[in-house]
Structures are given as structure tokens and as C-alpha cells.
Amino acid sequence: MHGKSLGSSRKNDSRSKIRQEKESNIDFDEKHDEYLINLQQRNRALNNSKAKDATQIKLQHLEEGFSLYLNGANADLRKQQSTQDLARESSKSSKIPDDGCSHLPGRRSQTAPGKIQRKAWVQNSIQIKSERGSRVYIGPNTKYSEDFESDDDMNEDQASDQYKYFTDSEKNVPQGPGKKRLVLDASDVKALRESLEISLCLQQDSKYSLDDDDADFVEEELIECETPELDSPSKTQLESKHQAFGHQRLLPGDFVVLEFNALDKKDGRMLTAKRKDNSEFYIPTKPVMVKNKTPRLKSSSFSSKDSFFPRPESRQEILLPTPRRSISENKDSRPSVSTVVDAINNENEAITRAISDGKTEKMTSGPSGISEGVVTKAIEKINLMKISQQKKLLKVLQDIDNDSSTNSNSEGEILKWDSVYLDPAVKDVICITVEILSNWGNQYYIGLTEIQFFDLKNEEIYVSPHDVDIRNVDVPGDPTCLVNGKTLTTKEHFMWTCPFHPPVQLYFIIRNATKSGDFDISKMKIWNYNKALSDLDIGAKLVKIYKDETLVFDGLLAKGSGNQDFDYSNTIDLHSGQIKSSSFISDQFSDETQISNSLGASNNIELKHQSDGLVYTSEQLSSILSEGSNQAKTSQQKDLHFENNTKGLRTFQDEALNKSFQHLALTSSSINCQEDITEGEVGIKMSYNKEEHFKINQSKDFNTMTAELQMVSATSSKEPPPCPRDDNDLTVTDQLERTPGRKECSSLNRFPPWLSSSSNFQQKSHNQPTKNHLNASSSTFTNKRSDQDINQFLDEYVKSSNTYSNKNFKNCSQSKMLCSSSKMDNEDDLENFSNQSSYNSDRPVSGRRKTVQMQDKSEKYEGASFHKTINPVDTKNLRPRWQNDQENNLLESWTSLIKFNKSHRGRISNLEFEGDIFDEFLQQQQKAGKQSDSTKNGSSLMPKGATEIHLESEKEEGSNFEIPVLPYGQHLCIKIVTTWGDRHYVGLNGIEVFASTGKPVEISRIRADPPDINILPAYGKDPRVVVNLIDGVNRTQDDMHLWLAPFSPGKLHFINLDFVEPCRVAMIRIWNYNKSRIHSFRGVKEVEIFLDNELIFKGEIAKASGTLSGAAEQFGDTILFTTDDEILQAMSLFDETFSEELKATETPTEHEIDSLRPSTADSIKEERPFTQAGLSEKLQSNLTDVSENYSDKLPGIYSGKCLLLNFTMTWGDPHYLGLTGMEIVGRDGKALAITLDALSACPQDLSILPEYKDDLRTLDKLIDGVNITNEDTHMWLIPFASGADHTITINFNKSEDIAGIRFWNYNKSPEDTYRGAKIVYVTLDGHAISPPGGFLIRKGPGNCHFDFAQEILFVDYIHEQQILEKQLRSHSKCMELATMDYEAPLMPCGFIFQLQLITSWGDPYYIGLNGLEM
């Protein structure tokens, strides 16, 4: 019985185990299915994450086909397929049953290689022992697929084997149902090739115009686009094939068969066997077969072995799985393909018709023959192919059509189409390189003033300073000076200089900002170095100019003028390579031809009339200047152009030149004319060899020589001196006289050359009637100017020269020489040089010089002659008188300048031309207008010089705008035009406006457009807002008090200020942006200020220095609208800068010095001298007396019983607020006694929180006296909530006088100091005594190395300024001002040195230092 029960129990146990095993198997299968589903989803997500964008796909295309060691040492050792292998493979491919599997819509693609074993994936059979004791063998599934999708095609291996390559032996086998063949002859091949070239060019051009929305067209094309594929060969096979029949030529009887695949075949994405990220795309190929009826081509090397292209065995055709993302059929992967195909079809139809009309009868050898539309059909098939396949086909067609002439024509046509379609239509940049090879004599430096570029429309091209580079130099200087727009200037900081080590290269990048199609540079202008006459040798001389690495100019540049009145530019035509130097005085006159004819007729000198001057031949000029010359000997006839830097220089006849040089050299001085011929540029240097004791520097008195040559030439040719032929010859003085505010220069050292050139002329006007002189002049020269105009001109000139009428003839001649800064040691030479036209008698000379007889036999001006003999005795006193006159004139000029500076300088709105871009614009406009007028009127209107244009523009500008006196209004608008160089930001430190009462104007509202940089996406809470401009803190570099806004050149930038009430504005002070020396270039430069829409100022604001030192002029500009002394005196009382300057200039009197001197010990008094660094008892007693006398009137001291402190902000901690200690400062500066009963807080401490019941940081720690500590047991801490009140209330027993509060902020550690209080509001008996923004409490240091107490005195926030307050504040101990009532110890020794920083340079909240040295 017992055995039966045991047996039944065992059966039940076995049954339960079997049931459990079945259930576990079911659970395992379910879990396994869930695992497979999850794994499949993960694989799909991984594939989606590996999807590539268009850029990655393009890179993938570029990286395809590369393999390592392609041409290595073992490249030829690979196994070569034999003929048996080829036959075996061809027979195997022919035995494949055509069961229709190949015609399925899509074939299953295996995405993972089967031979690669996954890591940690067990594929071998395993043996598992079950619970019943039996052994179970489990093996992997042989049909496992990685993507776990259903296997719809069980015959994919057989189907994949079907796609094999066919040899040439199969060309006669009937083509399958999915194949399409076209037979072309030679003419068809040529037409197809030409059409395909055009098609590819069009498609390549359309590729550039695709939108960003279609960036994924490559992926879509590879997956969905159903295209017929031409079986084109690979690259290496094409090369071998090309070598096979490269020496042959396609004859008219030869045919080419194009075979296309089925239309329903889709592109499959080929994944390589290796696990790579960059997959390759497989394109099945077939060879292009050439049929020929003649046996010649069959016996050639183009055999079946050469034409067979075996598929690489390492690559297997593995297609993507059938399920793909659905893409709309109507969405083409390339939107422009359809339009391009239509255009190509239309064009090809026309080409096909043209070819078919002129084509002879063709021979047909294919199974279906050749029809007239075979080319059209081929093009339709080819258009459906991919671009890469079309390119391969084009290469094959070019190889087949091997005619040399055809190939050359096709290549030329391809280049033509590439230039039309593929090259960019717009040229973006042009690179200009200016290579400086030499200068005008300076051994150390090279310099230029300005370089400008002009386009084909003769408009100036803007060049950014960032696009200028100086190369081949160690110290490049400031390249921005080359493109700063300062052309006519003598200021050195506007010019570019650097150490000269030739060659120096200036590199410019000229950008096509307008994106115009005809962008090019027609010419460029170069202004040479122009600081002063003595520094003109720094200017560049021999230069080479390269345009995009092509030499376009090689020649000389003219020197500068040494002044800012004349245009000294060099215009270089980059197309012709010619240079034209601007003269100082225009030399293009209407009567130039007549002068040249009259001068050339008498001397047989060939004069060529050109647009830029008169031309001599070298042989004739050398004969003129051969006397005394050692170098001017040439035998060839060369054209020598007199190119110089003055506008008065002209070529003269040989007699005039000979006599002028005789006058210059006097007796035996030799003249050398050195010719510098450099590639069409010929410069003539004239140097004077001093035989005795004088030498003339040609670079300095070149202008004077020019004027003298003119005078001598006219005199020696028996003609009276000519009158000016246009406005620019002698009317420069007239211009100066008619210009307001322009005074006549009386300094002989700076005497203008145009005045010196007419000194003799002026003297003659006193010695003979003016009318006769004018008649003689007008009879000689055919001048367009009337006699009446000349009379008027001379009358004005004589009136303007009355200052010099009382001087003798010698002084006039001396001043003429001084204008060119030349120093003569012999006064006889000076006399002869200046008075050459006045004497016809022999001049006595001293020394070894011989007398020179004047060639003039008659010097009569309509019956009036000059005969004056100079006594040699008169020349003895010449130098003393010359020195006295020079000193007197210099003193007069200096005195005049000082008077002008005192009386008129502050009243001129536009003092100088430099720096005003609006004046430059007006000058250019006036130049253009006057040039156009002169062109219309012909030769009757002469072009005006640069000086007259400058003076007239200055006059017009000055007359159009004047600074008003005390303008009245309420709305002030500041328009910012430019900055000091920054192209992105503009900023200011502050704006101050003072009324006519002397007080600052109260501003109700300020706004700006753009408001600040917070409008930019990268900014959001930047403190540099526009309100900071009127916060009163101007001399600072703190961002909390600056204003910064985005700046866009050419756009409008405004700052608008609204006054509380209308007033008369007396002064506006603008504090420019002063963040640092670099950031100071963000400051405003040119501004226009409007008051109630009335312009009250237009000009330039000085750039800030970027430092905190210096006077107010170092931080901006002050604009005065009045010179009334009473208003200025009233403004000085409220102007902080004036008080600071006054303090800096104050010097203590002797009594003050004695009272500040510390007392010392003597034998009379027994008291010990006071040596402690503090206040003496005498000063303390005086302070006590003063305090008692003025106790009721002291500002900043408040009386009350209930003091309330409200803390509203911490230094960053959002949860806790704390203090270390606190004291209430009384009247005498001592702390008031506070008991714990009088002290209360809300919240009390941390005990209100459940977890801080027994916390020691309670309220009584504030008054325990332990303040300099890091222990939080002596600190007070409470919970903090932003926006809530956190108060401390102190109730005194009686009314107390309170002067301030002393705080020790929370100081547990540097990290915990952010819990310290930051803002506190103080009220006494309900009355607020703190400013509207509260008191700012300094953050604790986090250590206890020093006393970090902060004393807040109410008196510091009182704005009343009275003398009594200043005295009390100066003696107050709390201010801790320096005093001399102590003796400094000698070499103090200690561990801790304490520096008490009393004040900052304007910042009320922060103070700092850069460093300390001891």
C-alpha cells in the first residue's frame, strides 16, 4: 500500500515536471520572440541613425573605388583567369534556368555578410542536459537573417547567380525580353557624342541650382529611381580597351551596338563584405561591342579576352531589403532633371534632323537595321541613366571616335561649354600686389599716404582695412592708413610708414561687394608720402604692380608736394600700364599748342602736343644742356617726359633753359642733367655741382626752380613776363585772399612758392604802369581771360601784397629763395638769381668766378626799361638784414597764431579738412561738377586746382552750418554716423548736458535705436544699456556704466534724450567708449546733434584713451554753445571735471604748509612729539568743538528710536542669507550700544525650519563682538526667499543720532560668502534714509586675514555741497583722509601691511588694482 502511494506520487511529480517544462518552453519561446522583435526594432533604429545626408553621400561617392596598395609590388601577382575559367563561367551562366525569378519586382537583399561571425554569438551546436536527465542538442538556424524579416525569396542565391557578365561570344545570342540594343554607325556615334557632351554640361550646370530642400536626392535616386543601365566598363578596363584600338580609326562601315538593361530593374545598394561605414554602390556593366563587316577589325587585338570584363570575386551582389520608406512618385530626386531632359530632347531632335538630312544612305547589319531616329532613341535611353554612367559612355564614345580632328574639336567645345556653364559668372575678388623696390633717397623708411582703386565705371571701390597686408617686412606699420581715405594731408598719423628693406610688398584683396558681372579694376591712384618737404624722400619711387600675379605696371611714382593744398596723386591705368602724375597746378591750357609752336619754331625743337605735357627728344635736349654736363650724352632719339610734382613746370626752348641755368649757376657753376630711363618712364634730375661754396638741394627747391624757369624763359626770349593763363597759375593768392579766415603767411621759412614766384612780378608792378604790362602780356599770349579780369586780378594782388611793399628788392628775392628752404652762402648769388630779369649790365663777382654777360640786348616793356646797378658794398649788409627780417616775421607770425588760437579757434565749426568724411564727399562732388562744366564749355573754362576746390568747399561748408549760440529746446537727438574703426559695435560712457543756468539738465527719458546689444541673439542680460549714459559715472571702465549697441555702417543710429522742461543748452559733454585701449575704437567718431529737429552740431568726437588717467579731453569732447563768462562760471560749480582739475592745480600756501608740518621736539617744550599715524589731540579737540557748534546742522546724521533694516538680495545664494556682525555708528563715529532685548528679526533664524531646531547661528551673534572670524557659530543665518522682506529691527530706549552702519558680511568660507547680504534698505522711524536703490554691501573675503568691515555713512550719499560740509568731511575720522601730522618710520618691518583704499576713479561700487610692488 505504501509502495503504491509512492509510485503514484512519483508519477504525479513527473507529470508536474513535464507540465512545468512545457510551460517553461512556451515562456522561453515567447520571450525569445519578444527578444527577436526588440532586436529587429533596434537594428532598424540603428540603420535609421546611420542614415547619411547629402554631404556624407558625396564624400562616400568620392571615397569609393580606392584600395590600398593598388600599384604595389604584388599588384601583378594576382591570379590571372585562364580561358578555361572563362569558358566554365560562361557555360555555367548559360545553364541557369529561366524560372522567372529574375523578373520579380524586387529581390531580397541580405544586409549582413553570412561568413562573418558576430562577436559573442554562438553559432556552433551545443549540448544541454535536461532535468529528466536526457541530453538535448541545439544547433543554429541555417536560414538566419540579421534583419529578422520574412524570407519571401528562397532562391536568392540562384537568382543572384543569374546576373553574370556575357562575353563577346554571346553577341549573336538572341537578347532576352528585358534587353534593348541599338546599332549606330560612325556618323551616329559622332552626333551622339556631341549631344551627350552638351547634355552633361547642362546637367552639371543644373546641379548647382538645386535647393537645400532636395539635399537628399542622392539617397532617393539610389533606392527608388528606376533607370535603364548601360553596361559600361570600369576605368582600368577602359584604359586597356583604349590601348587596344587606340591606333585604329572608326570607318564609315563600322557599327557600334549599345545594349541597355531592362526598365524594371531597380538599383541595388551594394554593401562590401567588410564592415565599413562607407558602403559602395554596385553598377552592373557590359562591354560596348563594335561590329564590323570587314575582317580587319576582327583580327585586331580587340578580342574576346580583351573585351570581357569579369566581375571582381571579392564583391558579391547584395541588395537592400524590399521594404523601404515610401517616397512620393511625383517627387523627383532632382527637380531640374525633367526640364533638362526636355530641353536636351528638343535640341537633340534638331541635331538629329540636321544630321539625318545631310547623311548618306547607311549600311544596315543589325537584326532590325538602323532607322532615322536611332540617335533620338539612344538619347532618350541615355537621358534616363545616371550622370556617372553618362560620363562613362561619353568617354567610350570619345575613344571610339578616335579621329584627331574630331577629338580636338570636341575638347574645344567641352572647354567652351565648361566656361559658359561651369565657371562662376561673377568674379568675387581681385588680388593686387604693389611691390616697392626703391624710395626717393631715404635709407631707413618707406612710406605712402593713400591707395585707391576704381572700377570700370570710374567709381571708387571700398577696400576693407582687414584686406590689406604688408609683406616682407619685420615691422609692417599700420596698414589701415593706406585705405583710410586721407589723401590730401600732411599729418603723419594718417600715413603709412615702415622700415625699408626692399622689396616691400603691399597686398590688397579687392572684393566684388556689388556682385556685378563686369567687376574689374580699371585704374588705381597712389598718393606718395607727404609729411613735409624734408621728408619726401621717404616716398616710394620704383614700384611694380601685379594684378592676380600678372605684372601690369613697372615704373616710377612722383614725389609728394609737402603740403595738403595740391593733388599729388599718381593715376595708374591697369589696362594700358600707363601712369599719369597729377600736377600741383594744371598745365592743360587752351593755348598750349600755340605756345609750343612759337617756342619750337625759333629753335627747331620737336614739340609733341600730348594730354599730359610737351615732349622733347633726347638728342635735342642733350644739346641744350650739354654745356658743363658729364652725363647727359645720348646718341639715340628717345622721348623724355618732364614728369614732376609741380603744376607749374613746362618745357621751354633751349635758349630759355640755357639762360635760366646761367642765372642759377651765375659764373662757372656746372649743370648736370641726369637721365633716369626706366621702361618708358623718364625722370630728369637736375643737380647743381657747387664749385665754390654753395649747393642747391633739388628735392627742396624744385618748386622755386619751376617758377624761376618760367620767369627767365619769358624774359630771355625778349618777351614780357606772361600773365597767368588760367585761374591756377597765379590766382592761388587771389584764392587765399578771398578765403575767409585765411591769413597771409609772413614766415619766410614757410613762404609759399606761388608767392615767391611772383615777387619780382610784384616789384615790377610798382616800377611801371600796370596797364602797359598787361597789354604786353596779352599781346604775347593768346589768353582767353579778358584784360578786365587781369586788371582786377592784379589790383587785388597788389592790395594783398601791401605788407611787403615797403621792403627793398633784395629782401623780396631772398624770401623767394627761402620758400624752398635752400640755404645760400653768397648773397650775390641770391641777388642774381632773383633779379635776373632786371639787369642788363655785367655783375661784379668775387673770387674765381667769371662774369656772365646777359644775352638780352633790350629789356623794354612798352618803352619802360629797368637799369639798376648793384654796388658791391650793398651786399655786405645783406645777411644781417635778412636775419633780422626773418626773426621779425617769425615773431609776427607766432604772435598772430597765438591771438587767433585764443580768440577764434573755439568758434570755428569745421577747423580743418582732415577727418570729415562729409567734406571729402563734397570735394569729390565739386570736382566732378567742375570737370563736367569745363568739358562742356571747352577751352574757355579752365579746370580749377585742388587748392581752390578745397578752399571753396571749406567756405561753403562753413557758410552752410554754424554752431548756434544757446539753442533752445526739449528733445535732444544724437545721430551717430561713424565709429573710430569698429565695424560691428558702437558705444559711449556717458552724456552730460548743461543749461544756460549752469546746472545739469534733468533728463526724463533716454532711449536709443538700436537700444543695446541685448537685441542680438547671443546676448540677453548684458548690463551695457542706454540708461547708463546718464547715471553720472563717466570716468570708468566698468560694464555697469557703459552703453554698447550693434553698429551697421550706412544705417541710422540714434540716441534721444527728453528733458524735463525746455531750456537753453550751454554745453554738451560726450564721454566716449573707454572700456580699454582696444575697445576704445568702438567709440563714436562723427556725430550730428539735433535739438527739436534743428541741427546744432556736426563734427568729430575725440577717441577715448582707454585708460583712467588724464584730463577730461582724454575721454571725449566738450561742445560749448556759449562763451559767456558768467555761464561758464556757473557751470564750473556743478561740473565735476572742473573741480577735479582745480584740485589738481591747487598749491598750498606757506601758512598751510606750516600748519600741516608735524611738530618736533625742542629744548623748550617737554612734550613728546606726535609720531603716531593718526589725528593729533589738537585736531581731535578742534573737530569736537566744530561738531558741538554745528551739531544741529550736520547733514547725514539722523535722529530716531526705531531703526529698520530690510535685506532684499544676496550675493548669489537663492536659499540662505547671513551676516557676521553689525554695528550702528553714532555721531562721534563710535558704535552705539545695542542689547538683545532691543534687537528683533523676521525671520528670526534657522530655527523656523524643522531640521534646524538647535542651530547656533542665531540673532544674538550679530552683536557678540566676534566679527573677524570664519566660524559660523559667531554668525547669523536665516532662510532667504527672493522678493520677500528680511528685516532686522532695533528699538532704542531713547532717540539716538545715527551717522551710519558698519557691516561684517557672511564669511564662513569663500564658497559660503555668496550667502552674504548684498542690498539693504534703511528706514528710521518710518522715513527712508537709504537711496532708491538701497545700500550695496560688499561680499565677504572668505578669510580673516584683515578687517573686512564696511562702513556705510549716510553723509556720503548727500548731494549738497557746502563749505562747512567739506570741512567736516575732511576732518571726519571715518573718511580716513591722509594727513601729514605724523612721522613715517624708517624701513618699517612687519608681517601684514594694510592699504586702505579710500576712493576710486568714479566707480561707487567697486575698486581694484592691477598690482603691488614692495
UniProtKB/Swiss-Prot annotation:
GO terms for cellular component: cell projection; cytoplasm; cytoskeleton. Pfam families: DUF4457. Residues 1-32, 80-116, 139-158, 712-731, 756-783, 823-861, 924-943 are annotated as: Disordered. The keyword Transmembrane does not apply. Keywords: Cell projection, Cytoplasm, Cytoskeleton. It is found in: Cytoplasm, Cytoskeleton, Cilium axoneme; Cytoplasm, Cytoskeleton, Cilium basal body; Cytoplasm, Cytoskeleton. Residues 147-158 have a biased composition (Acidic residues). May control cilium integrity. This is Protein KATNIP homolog.
